[in-house]
Amino acid sequence: GSRYPGFSTKKKSTSIESKLTLAIRDVTGQSTQLFAAVKTEPGVHATHQIVSFQLEKESFSDNTELLKMKLNAALPADIAVTSLEIADERFVASLAVKSCTYTCRIATDPAAALFSRPYTCVVTESLDLESMQQAAQLLTGTHDFAAFSNGRTKKSTVRTVETIKINREDQLIQIQLTANSFLRHMPQLLAGTILTAGKEKKTDRTTLTLAGVESA
């Protein structure tokens, strides 16, 4: 995700979608439309993205491993197809999403992120894990998360955050957010709110009020 402005953008030639579409065309000789389970944002690294597409010809229907190998050979080194299988012709990845999970990695010591800097946020301030856990608990559930988006959507901003898990191992902290779906920028803003609670070492229900979150 480091080199790309997201999965799908207006500048299609630089997006992950464009690279994958081009690889499919080069390998199969067919142009196709991609449907992604989640349209990731700039700098987001997707480890389990699901993409569906249709091919008219069945030249690879009996050998998906060969198609996967050829696609990976045609793709940039920082994009990879990890699994490929034939789905029901009615399956559309963008319509089949039940939930998605984002993970925010935080290092409290720059040395702890030496080999994972592109995927890790370095925060040198002292963080109070208990305050972060309390903020996470308040943000879990069904709320109007309008304040946690770029404000450009005309659709409902009510979302259900199913779980927020915070784990710490030495100088590394992971915030794992799972929701039925996320608004644009919502994962980053949720993680930022939890981080703020950890820095200030205090949190109560004003966390929701200050963030503009309303129970739905």
Predicted regions: what they are:
Residues 1-216:
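Structured-RNA-binding interfaces characteristic of tRNA pseudouridine synthases
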